[in-house]
UniProtKB/Swiss-Prot annotation:
One GO cellular component, as annotated: bacterial nucleoid
Name of the protein in question: DNA repair protein RecO
Gene3D superfamilies: Nucleic acid-binding proteins, Recombination protein O, C-terminal domain
UniProt keyword list: DNA damage, DNA recombination, DNA repair
Entry function: Involved in DNA repair and RecF pathway recombination.
PANTHER family per record: DNA REPAIR PROTEIN RECO
Length: 234
């Protein structure tokens, strides 16, 4: 890839580089995660734009792993997230950085990310966060089977299951591994628009299950955003 023009993108992470440049990790709609250097950030007026939670249109050039940004334009209003919403936003960025490779497109995840950021600022974001996590796992090759159990039988909403990423769902009481959830929770996660994910106890069960699945794919990596959640609770 020699470069790209006018790509919708979000900043996942940024840090200062040399005297007047910035290194950024971008999540682009068409190309996935992109590492880039932004030269002359202050001179070009990019300082206030290369921030998380601001929709951008960017162009870059370069064939290697680290591109050079050539244009940066704000593509919509930014989101001033606070408290738990900010921690959720950082969480999404962290799992994207951990579970994706550069220049590996994740178009559905990109769409779910954009929706989730908007929900963090305006609404109950938990259903949008779950849909983001599911899309990320699916497009990263870790998709979950949520509508059939390990024996190929349809998941029953009223039944209890233990769910493990390696095996899937098995009736509770037949094994000790995995997270115990209701069939209703699994079916709510499987629903295209996540119907029912705002209601308890489905809401808390879905959160607990997805946390366990994501953590398994992170290996031993610790997320700083989880420390933010704990500090907010304290």
């Amino acid at each position: 890839m020699n470069g790209a023009q006018g790509q919708p993108a979000w900043v996942l992470h940024r840090r200062a580089f040399r005297e007047s440049s910035t290194l950024v990790e971008l999540f682009s709609q068409e190309y996935g995660r992109i590492g880039a250097v932004a030269n002359g950030v202050r001179r070009r007026g990019w300082s206030g734009q290369l921030e998380p939670f601001i929709p951008l249109q960017v162009s870059w050039r370069g064939r290697g792993d680290l591109k050079t940004l050539t244009t940066v334009d704000q593509a919509g209003r930014g989101y001033a997230l606070r408290g738990g919403a900010l921690a959720c936003g950082f969480y999404m960025a962290e799992v994207l950085l951990a579970l994706t490779r550069r220049e590996d497109p994740h178009p559905r995840t990109w769409e779910r990310y954009a929706v989730a950021v908007d929900c963090l600022a305006t609404d109950d974001a938990e259903p949008a966060l779950r849909r983001f996590e599911l899309a990320l796992l699916e497009e990263s090759g870790y998709g979950l089977e949520l509508e059939q159990d390990v024996h190929g039988e349809p998941v029953v909403a009223q039944a209890r299951y233990r769910y493990s990423p390696e095996r899937g769902a098995d009736r509770a009481g037949t094994g000790e591994c995995g997270v115990e959830v209701s069939g209703a929770t699994l079916l709510a996660l499987a629903a295209t628009e996540g119907q029912g994910l705002s209601e308890e106890p489905v809401r808390s069960e879905a959160r607990r299950l997805m946390r366990a699945v994501i953590q398994q794919h992170l290996g031993g990596r610790r997320l700083r955003s989880r420390e933010m959640f704990r500090s907010l609770r304290d």
